[in-house]
């Protein structure tokens, strides 16, 4: 009983103050004359075993971003953190990200989720670039970039995404016009998830699923549920030593493996259909990213399959939640919404003629997406296992140290962003060319930036463009939404949104 009493007292402490956290005002530490040793870096308070106990009892770290945010307020812009035997250094200033990139070599190393590796090793699956480090990562990444991340690839798949975004807008309009009021109030989350699956599946595999025209098929619903379970169980397992979690979290491991089985099965079926069609006759036209890789990339089929599964799993939630949060922010900031609508209407004819022009014709909408990801980064951490010694905030960081950048705190720091609590897309246009590019880090940096970055940007940009042309988006909710950490950051609940047709 004594141990539980101590544990509960420790666990209660951080959470009592989280909702009262002040606006972060952390600036760089003024450097003394000599570089300080690693051991002098401020240490995250509390005992290591208590954090493992907390993780086990609460089945995750849903308030992880808030606790880390508060720790920066108390300790400054750098501190050490240890949980489950994993030592790391956390930072939150753009200058420290720049220093980390400057010491990157040919093979930037990142931390990879242990549960994801465990699943692939035990099932005998090859790893994609998200889970690789070293020369193998570089070889595969260089083969993938032309077909996925290049401007040429984006120009090819943008018209495909535009077709899905138009269909989404038309389907929503049909539902709205069924009401005599010409408006519809609903939970838009299921529709947005169906859109991201439909668009991503078309871009990756060249195949429409028909999710926008009718109720989704059971396989798609199972896939969405599997993604939710996979992300949530990842956090429940990744910070605990496997030697411990195999005994204390057997049910969670079972859920995690079953979720990945569903994800792999879903992607494998799409890959098998595409592979058969390609072997029967090479298509003369562009038919998606995976077809391009199978016909042009110098990669094995297993490597293409592994990376296709990573792209499939990573292209749904990570696009859907920024879309949902953007719609919410525009609904409670009608003046911003109107400015974006005017931009979209002015560019509508040019984008209709050539959807690729959306990238250059909608600068304020692109800024709005940056602003959403500043406040609500899907991945709250960027990390590097530094391969050479460096100095951060005048502390020596030895080679091999895991350094994590907390994007949640970086985006809410008034030393970097004036009035950070305000949703103000114009700030990104006002600051063009006036400073570092590192404040916008939602998709990572350097060679290890998100492989699906351009696909995600196009999916979000075109959907919002077509929605804003056709609907006013409204809400009664003005309060901030509570965000929770489940490997990605998601809203705990979403308010109803009203879509009102524009004649």
Curated annotation (Swiss-Prot):
Enzyme's top EC category: oxidoreductase
Subcellular compartments: Mitochondrion inner membrane
Metabolic or biological pathway: Steroid biosynthesis; glucocorticoid biosynthesis; Steroid hormone biosynthesis
Keyword list, A-Z: Heme, Iron, Membrane, Metal-binding, Mitochondrion, Mitochondrion inner membrane, Monooxygenase, Oxidoreductase, Steroidogenesis, Transit peptide
The EC number(s) this enzyme carries: 1.14.15.4, 1.14.15.5
Catalytic reaction(s) noted: a steroid + 2 reduced [adrenodoxin] + O2 + 2 H(+) = an 11beta-hydroxysteroid + 2 oxidized [adrenodoxin] + H2O; 11-deoxycortisol + 2 reduced [adrenodoxin] + O2 + 2 H(+) = cortisol + 2 oxidized [adrenodoxin] + H2O; 21-hydroxyprogesterone + 2 reduced [adrenodoxin] + O2 + 2 H(+) = corticosterone + 2 oxidized [adrenodoxin] + H2O; corticosterone + 2 reduced [adrenodoxin] + O2 + 2 H(+) = 18-hydroxycorticosterone + 2 oxidized [adrenodoxin] + H2O
Positions bound to heme: 450
Membrane topology label: Peripheral membrane protein
Domain of life per record: Eukaryota
A molecular-function term among this protein's GO annotations: iron ion binding
Signal sequence segment: none
Any one GO CC term of the record: mitochondrial inner membrane
Coiled-coil segments: none
Database matches in PROSITE patterns: CYTOCHROME_P450 (PS00086)
Pfam families according to UniProt: p450
Biological process per Gene Ontology, one example term: cholesterol metabolic process
Transit peptide segment: 1-24
Required cofactor(s): heme
UniProt cross-references to PANTHER family, sorted A to Z: CYTOCHROME P450, CYTOCHROME P450 11B2, MITOCHONDRIAL
Family per record: Belongs to the cytochrome P450 family.
Physiological role: A cytochrome P450 monooxygenase that catalyzes the biosynthesis of aldosterone and other adrenal corticoids. Differing from other species (such as human, rat and mice), it is able to catalyze three sequential oxidative reactions of 11-deoxycorticosterone (21-hydroxyprogesterone), namely 11-beta hydroxylation, followed by two successive oxidations at C18 yielding 18-hydroxy and then 18-oxo intermediates, and ending with the formation of aldosterone. Steroid 11beta, 18- and 19-hydroxylase.
Name of the featured protein: Cytochrome P450 11B1, mitochondrial
Taxonomic placement: Eukaryota, Metazoa, Chordata, Craniata, Vertebrata
């Amino acid at each position: 009983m004594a141990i539980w009493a101590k544990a509960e007292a420790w666990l209660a402490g951080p959470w009592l103050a989280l909702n009262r956290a002040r606006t972060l005002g952390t600036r760089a530490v003024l450097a003394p004359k000599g570089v300080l040793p690693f051991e002098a870096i401020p240490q995250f308070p509390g005992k290591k075993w208590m954090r493992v106990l907390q993780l086990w009892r609460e089945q995750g770290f849903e308030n992880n971003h808030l606790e880390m945010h508060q720790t920066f307020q108390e300790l400054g812009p750098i501190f050490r953190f240890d949980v489950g035997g994993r030592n790391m250094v956390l930072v939150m200033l753009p200058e420290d990200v720049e220093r980390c990139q400057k010491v990157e070599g040919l093979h930037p190393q990142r931390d990879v989720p242990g549960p994801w590796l465990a699943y692939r090793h035990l099932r005998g699956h090859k790893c994609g670039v998200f889970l690789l480090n070293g020369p193998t990562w570089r070889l595969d990444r260089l083969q993938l970039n032309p077909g996925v991340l290049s401007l040429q690839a984006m120009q090819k798949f943008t018209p495909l995404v535009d077709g899905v975004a138009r269909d989404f807008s038309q389907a929503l309009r049909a539902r709205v016009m069924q009401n005599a009021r010409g408006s519809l109030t609903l939970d838009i989350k299921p529709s947005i998830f169906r859109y991201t699956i439909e668009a991503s599946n078309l871009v990756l595999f060249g195949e429409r699923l028909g999710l926008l025209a009718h109720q989704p098929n059971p396989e798609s619903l199972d896939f969405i549920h599997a993604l939710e379970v996979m992300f949530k169980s990842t956090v429940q397992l990744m910070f605990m030593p496997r030697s411990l979690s195999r005994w204390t979290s057997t049910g969670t491991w079972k859920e995690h493996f079953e979720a990945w089985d569903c994800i792999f099965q879903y992607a494998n079926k799409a890959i098998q259909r595409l592979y058969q069609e390609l072997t029967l006759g090479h298509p003369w036209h562009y038919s998606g990213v995976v077809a391009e890789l199978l016909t042009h990339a110098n990669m094995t089929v297993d490597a293409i399959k592994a990376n296709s599964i990573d792209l499939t799993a990573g292209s749904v939630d990570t696009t859907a939640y920024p879309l949902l949060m953007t719609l919410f922010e525009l609904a409670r900031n009608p003046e911003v919404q109107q400015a974006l609508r005017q931009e979209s209407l002015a560019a509508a004819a040019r984008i209709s003629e050539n959807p690729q022009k959306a990238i250059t014709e909608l600068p304020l909408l692109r800024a709005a997406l940056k602003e959403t990801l500043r406040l609500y980064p899907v991945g709250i951490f960027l990390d590097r296992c530094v391969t050479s010694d460096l100095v951060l905030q005048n502390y020596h960081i030895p080679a091999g140290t895991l350094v994590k950048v907390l994007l949640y705190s970086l985006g809410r720091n008034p030393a970097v962003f004036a009035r950070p609590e305000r949703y103000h897309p114009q700030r990104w246009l006002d600051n063009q060319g006036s400073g570092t590019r590192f404040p916008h880090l939602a998709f990572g940096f350097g060679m290890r930036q998100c492989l699906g970055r351009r696909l995600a940007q196009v999916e979000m940009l075109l959907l919002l463009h077509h929605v804003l042309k056709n609907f006013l988006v409204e809400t009664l909710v003005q309060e901030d939404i509570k965000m929770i950490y489940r490997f990605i950051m998601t809203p705990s609940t979403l308010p109803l949104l009203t879509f009102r047709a524009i004649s």
